[in-house]
Amino acid sequence: MPGTKNDKPATEIAVAALLFDMDGTLVDSAAAVHSMYRRWAAKHGIGLESLMRVQHGRRSIEIATLYAHLGYDVAAETAWMVEQERTDPSPIVEVPGAAALLRSLPPERWAVVTSADRVLALRRLRAAGLPLPGVLVTADDVARGKPDPECFLMGAARLGFPAAECLVLEDAPAGLAGGQAAGAKVLALSTTLTPDELAPLPHVPDYRGVTACFEAGQVILRIAG
């Protein structure tokens, strides 16, 4: 019937490569992240609500630095946060459709660019049953975390493409800003922010309506209407 949602045409995005964030973009790790920050906030008398507003998509060291006026040792607190996340027993699952999408992509045309450390990133990707990337950029690899574009520029370079020819897939404001600062196209996941909060950026709730093919040297991402 004309005018219904099903009549909306599909959107196609053609790029050389895809740069995926991990937490909230490929895996749902919200329970583990919230559990760690709840304990850390209680430990230092920090308001949990305000902490959760600023932490998403950023490295542990940057969050520890943000509250360094409380007088603790930043390196020690960063190590505590990392260890708590590594050992948290909360389940880690894929964002719906993520595994199927990744398996449909040429392995040399996608990377994971995450604010997690390498040990945690590999652990979560495996726990969610996702294929491991050939290129993995983590908190260990960069001097400046998101929203600085360094990580996305590095991911694109390791794949062999300019960032301007890549698509960044992200759910967090810091990551979306970093992708844009790198000069990449961006596609947001509405797993953290609402569609209204993400507008006017293109966004999807998950990957169940997203397919990919490889044609004429380009990854063609097709988003159902």
Model-identified regions with their sequence ranges:
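N-terminal helical cap/lid subdomain that shapes the substrate entry/recognition surface
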Residues: 8, 12-106, 117-119, 130
